[in-house]
Swiss-Prot record:
Disulfide cysteine pairs (residue numbers): none
Pfam families xref list: ACT, GlnD_UR_UTase, HD, NTP_transf_2
Keyword Cell cycle recorded: no
Domain remarks: Has four distinct domains: an N-terminal nucleotidyltransferase (NT) domain responsible for UTase activity, a central HD domain that encodes UR activity, and two C-terminal ACT domains that seem to have a role in glutamine sensing.
Full protein name: Bifunctional uridylyltransferase/uridylyl-removing enzyme
Domain ACT: 680-760, 788-857
CDD domains (UniProt xref): ACT_ACR-UUR-like_2, ACT_UUR-like_1, HDc, NT_GlnE_GlnD_like
Catalytic activity: [protein-PII]-L-tyrosine + UTP = [protein-PII]-uridylyl-L-tyrosine + diphosphate; [protein-PII]-uridylyl-L-tyrosine + H2O = [protein-PII]-L-tyrosine + UMP + H(+)
Domain HD: 441-563
Organism: Cupriavidus metallidurans (strain ATCC 43123 / DSM 2839 / NBRC 102507 / CH34)
Function comment: Modifies, by uridylylation and deuridylylation, the PII regulatory proteins (GlnB and homologs), in response to the nitrogen status of the cell that GlnD senses through the glutamine level. Under low glutamine levels, catalyzes the conversion of the PII proteins and UTP to PII-UMP and PPi, while under higher glutamine levels, GlnD hydrolyzes PII-UMP to PII and UMP (deuridylylation). Thus, controls uridylylation state and activity of the PII proteins, and plays an important role in the regulation of nitrogen assimilation and metabolism.
Entry annotated with the keyword Cell division: no
Ranges where the record places region Uridylyltransferase: 1-322
Activity regulation text: Uridylyltransferase (UTase) activity is inhibited by glutamine, while glutamine activates uridylyl-removing (UR) activity.
Amino acid sequence: MDTTPELLLCQRIRDKLKADKQVLFAEFDANNQVNPLVTKLRRAVDVALTEAWTGLELPGDVALVAVGGYGRGELFPHSDVDVLLLLPGEPDAKMAAKLERFIGLCWDLGLEIGSSVRTVDDCIRESAADITIRTSLLEARLLIGNKALFKSLQTRYQADMDAADFFQAKLLEMRQRHAKYQDTPYALEPNCKESPGGLRDLQVILWMTEAARLGDSWKQLFERGLLTEREAQELTRNERLLRTIRARLHLLAGRRQDVLVFDLQTALAEAFGYRQTTNKRASEQLMRRYYWAAKAVTQLNSVLLLNIEAMLFPSESMVTREINDRFVERQGMLEITSDDLYERNPHAILETFLLYERTPGVKGLSPRTLRGLYNARTVMDASWRNDPVNRRLFLAIVQEPQGITHALRLMNQTSVLGRYLINFRRIVGQMQHDLFHVYTVDQHILMVVRNMRRFAIVEHTHEFPFCSQLMAGFDRPWVLWVAALFHDIAKGRGGDHSKLGTVDARRFCKQHGISREDTDLIAWLVEHHLTMSHVAQKQDLTDPDVVKAFAQVVGNGRYLTALYLLTVADIRGTSPKVWNAWKGKLLEDLYRITLRVLGGARLDTHSLWAQKRDDTIAQLRLKAFDPELAKPLWDKLDMSFFMRQDARDIAWLTRSLFNKVNSPNPVVKARISPAGEGLQVAVYVKDQPDLFARICGYFERKAFSIQDAKIETTRDGYALDTFQITDPGLAGDYRDILTLVEHELGERVRLECPLPDPTQGRLSRQSRSFPIKPRVDLRPDERGQYYLLSVSANDRTGLLYAIARVLAKHRVSVHSARINTLGERVEDVFLVDGSRLAADNRLQIQLEQDLLDALAI
């Protein structure tokens, strides 16, 4: 500001605007009415801008025009204020200076101003080339200035508007936007404006209809026949919820914030009146409401888009193919033959999805069918669920050899699945803040079904060849799809969801006439769907007792194969971060060794050692290595080493160390992991009390994640430690760093310098917002020789080093480590030397306390 009058003008307008906003925000806090808020905020800004325009005495031949959302007549607390400075011609230097002063004043008023300076010709030319500009001008609104000039813009804009072209451009833009958000409204941190099912989807519909002069409100679309009254009411209600969420987010963040970030979800939920219960956080209750609204928006959005498209692009050849007297196929879409079909014949609801699976060429449901399903929700009641015909139809859908995943997803999108399986409805939109699931429970369940179905599809056999091989020989695989549908169906009820889900599964099987044999398998899978994962990732698979106990739980090969396939599909369906090749190897190893036990193989130490020795010798001979050269190294190692290592790993270590068994210097060897992901690193050195911590510290500094560790001590005091590590940042390209790891880690071990203090590693926002209470469990194993140390906590960089340093401080040696990272949570299991712990109970207590301190956030 150059002059005192302008300073005074700015101060007066700013103070007035600030006071108006405070009053409006207080009203909103009191009544939670979002529509009056965004309207009154817009009016307050209108007044501020027109006063600034008048105060600066802008020329009368210029027009100040509101565009975008502001032009639409609504303004959220911290939204951009988009304006167009419409000129009659190119501005001279004097005009440009005045316009710059006006824009500067707007910023001084505290407005997030978005401005453009154009003539009418500029607007028409640029809107033709840019769909964003064309859209912003659709809702242009004159604030002050040259009315005739603004009218000229409107006339030319409307004359140039091609509704069909606009529809196609906005549809493409929407698809690109949805792809950016993975085509799902069910993100952990959805954007209430831009994500699928968000406010932008509603705006796109109204932009399309306004461009086609079909209406610019849900009421008008109802009057034009594009919506039913009920659909218009539903859209109005969900739009109001999304608007309220967006306004609350802005106010909580104190800035423009459209993403429901973890940091704000709890405060936002409390602003809506939600409170934490025994089974659900307040944030989970709010997010479920959001997901239901977004789902409804997505569903109605699909109906409206297809209807608008049909009006703008009437097909000249509306060829239909009759399927039966209830359904036809029209241009690849399954269509009902009468609007009231589902009310007259409720059986046709499930028949829709069976025909969708069975009819070649059908790729979706027509607008008429989608609308019919949407409006038939009241028909889907208890009597409909209990109808024997419907039960036969649903079982047929699940047993169909193709199209199952797509059919179930479509049933969920149209809310039919949740209305048929009423317990499924309870978990629709239920988020799991357990730090490793990234999908809502219903989406996770359908993802697991999809993963198992892919094992059965020839085109996907390259993804998991072993699983595909097992699936190909599995009789009646549909029992697996049913088990997948029920494995997490009891989440969020309180209690053990596996046992509660088992009851649901048995009831379903009884109601649907499923045989006793298949019922028992389905129910057993639901009850034990976590068992194999727990054994593989937390127990010692080289312990014959562990494998025998697991084999007793499983009982036979069919149950084992079914559980293995479900476990792989389940872990892969939690999050892209959770599955890795190492977990795959552990599960496959457990499957194969258990199958041997079930087949009658002996599982005693001597027979296993004999088999391992023969396999290792075969591996060595494949590499043209004389097995006799292995004797000096093998004579130094206990039988436990051979029991805990794979034959190919023993062969690799033998070839790497056979001529270095008495090396005075550390020997470090690294190779691409045979598991298919990451590195395998071996360290051979004179044993040190803090060796495990020292190695963990190196891996922490290099940002490697340790997946597994095996710690051995030779009879003459050497340590032979092997590690399975990964580095997410390398994206699988590890070859260039093998030599670097061997050199640097060797130096780190050789120097034996004091252990540095652990760093307080960074936590993800999710972990900060939903911390879990650290847990430490220390108990002796059955033989009393070792102690099992189980640790669970929020994951963070350097956590394993912090644990290892505490163990080193107390001179507790690590025998093995099983590192289980589940998204943002770790569940690690260590086998530690029990000699000192057994002799001193106080040491156990102090160790547990020090570990809890190290795990604390």
